[in-house]
């Protein structure tokens, strides 16, 4: 449950609304739209984190978004650290530190 709460805080908090700019190396078609080679694009992370098709209650704090049968389950559209070759290099360390900070805070209360 702790991981579900942390992930939901990151989803709702959404510190970085857009991903790092990227550019395709060749002409690409996405969803019927042509994106010419070299065109700068960015993923709108806010639209992913609040997508009504992905999240049961997108504008409500609900750790249940990350629970299935009482067990933590990460969703594919949850990408606060981006994805691919340009994902945050410090993601593993940041996740560990967030978990340790949050659990230490809970132990004090």
Question: How would you label these PLM feature ranges?
Answer:
Residues 1-32:
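Conserved cytochrome P450 K-helix E-x-x-R motif and the immediately C-terminal K′/meander segment
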Residues 13, 27, 43-71:
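Conserved cytochrome P450 K-helix/beta-meander segment immediately N-terminal to the heme-binding cysteine loop
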Residues 32, 88-92:
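Conserved, non-catalytic sequence blocks in retroelement Pol enzymes and Pol-derived host proteins
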Residues 69-79:
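Active-site-adjacent bridging/hinge elements
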Residues 74, 92-109:
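Cytochrome P450 heme-binding "Cys pocket" and the immediately downstream C-terminal segment
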């Amino acid at each position: 449950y702790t991981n579900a709460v942390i992930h939901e805080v990151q989803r709702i908090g959404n510190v970085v609304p857009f991903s790092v700019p990227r550019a395709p190396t060749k002409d690409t078609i996405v969803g019927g739209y042509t994106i010419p080679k070299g065109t700068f694009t960015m993923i709108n992370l806010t639209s992913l984190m609040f997508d009504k098709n992905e999240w049961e209650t997108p504008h409500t704090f609900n750790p249940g978004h990350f629970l299935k049968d009482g067990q933590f389950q990460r969703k594919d559209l949850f990408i606060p650290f981006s994805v691919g070759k340009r994902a945050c290099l410090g993601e593993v360390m940041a996740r560990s530190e967030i978990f340790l900070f949050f659990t230490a805070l809970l132990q004090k209360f």
